[in-house]
């Protein structure tokens, strides 16, 4: 853990990689317990949080409002990274919604992990940063329609209805209150949910293109403009259980049936990369996609946990 971060984490120059690294450690803590997690990864988390807080990342700036800012106008910096003519098809830039949801979650989780250690100053600083982040998250992203803007920059708020807002509800620690969480989740249910994943863009939004077909350039434009992604559905189902608890167990169970059926098509026993956003929801892209498989498997384990309560 004493090595530089660049020696430990692949693609550290991507703004969200460190945030997802903290999330991955958080999942390990659920399995192994906080004490063992702290012994194994505590120093790494300490280094990651300081790396971000000290503004040492080349494209992840912690602003005075407690929110993270990344420049993505000319180069794609999020998972929506398709390009056309050397430019991002979806130029998400500035305050990006899932970056800041992940940031709040990272602050809260790390503070809790270090709560019983001697580093009280570190914990107090994390808690203070989390409060500032939470105080400014909803005013920045939550709009008058009851969902989250996808990104905000220089006074502009992007109102495209995209699935990136689901992370603010699904993660263990949310900067939103209960009413806001329910509203965001319900928006995802109404406009983004399909039997094969969450759409990358609502059919009501400008530029909706649900069919991943045609030559490469045409597919690049459609890649994040309406296609459905199962790994996002994993977080959606987790959010359903977090907001509605036991009353959504049967609903989530029914959603999983669609993925069970998919195991007998394309590549037997696995799930393809993405699906068309409109019926009949044909599977497209790579015939097997690890993020989708792991996302659905995680929900299956989560269902087992709820069923055993």
Residue map of PLM features:
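Aromatic-rich carbohydrate-recognition surfaces in CAZymes
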Residues: 1-71, 97-100, 104, 227-246, ...
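Acidic/His metal-coordination segments adjacent to aromatic residues that form catalytic metal sites
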Residues: 1-12, 72-95, 154, 212-222, ...
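Aromatic (Trp/Tyr) and acidic
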Residues: 5-8, 82-93, 100, 157-194, ...
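Amphipathic repeat-derived elements
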Residues: 8-31, 35-38, 146-171, 215, ...
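Long alpha-helical scaffolds in large eukaryotic adaptor/regulatory proteins
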Residues: 32, 110, 114-121, 240-243, ...
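Catalytic cores of carbohydrate-active enzymes
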Residues: 50-53, 57-65, 69, 102-212, ...
């Amino acid at each position: 853990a004493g090595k530089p971060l660049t020696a430990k984490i692949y693609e550290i120059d991507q703004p969200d990689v460190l945030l997802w690294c903290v999330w991955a450690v958080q999942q390990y803590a659920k399995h192994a317990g906080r004490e063992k997690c702290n012994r194994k990864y505590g120093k790494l988390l300490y280094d990651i949080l300081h790396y971000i807080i000290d503004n040492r990342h080349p494209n992840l700036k912690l602003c005075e409002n407690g929110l993270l800012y990344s420049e993505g106008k000319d180069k794609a910096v999020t998972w929506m990274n398709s390009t056309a003519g050397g430019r991002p098809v979806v130029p998400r830039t500035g305050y990006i919604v899932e970056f800041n949801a992940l940031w709040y979650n990272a602050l809260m989780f790390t503070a809790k992990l270090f709560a019983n250690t001697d580093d009280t100053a570190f914990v107090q600083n994390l808690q203070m940063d989390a409060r500032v982040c939470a105080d400014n998250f909803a005013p920045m992203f939550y709009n008058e329609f009851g969902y989250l803007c996808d990104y905000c920059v220089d006074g502009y708020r992007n109102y495209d209805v995209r699935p990136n807002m689901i992370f603010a509800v699904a993660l263990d620690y949310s900067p939103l209150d209960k009413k806001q969480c329910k509203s965001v989740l319900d928006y995802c249910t109404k406009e983004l949910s399909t039997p094969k994943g969450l759409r990358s863009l609502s059919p009501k939004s400008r530029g909706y293109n649900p069919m991943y077909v045609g030559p490469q350039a045409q597919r690049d434009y459609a890649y994040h403009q309406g296609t459905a992604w199962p790994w996002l559905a994993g977080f959606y189902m987790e959010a359903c259980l977090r907001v509605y608890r036991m009353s959504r167990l049967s609903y989530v169970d029914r959603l999983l049936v669609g993925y069970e059926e998919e195991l007998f098509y394309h590549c037997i026993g696995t799930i393809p990369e993405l699906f068309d956003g409109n019926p009949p929801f044909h599977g497209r892209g790579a015939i097997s996609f690890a993020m989708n498989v792991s996302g659905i498997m995680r929900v299956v384990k989560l269902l087992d946990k709820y069923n055993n309560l």
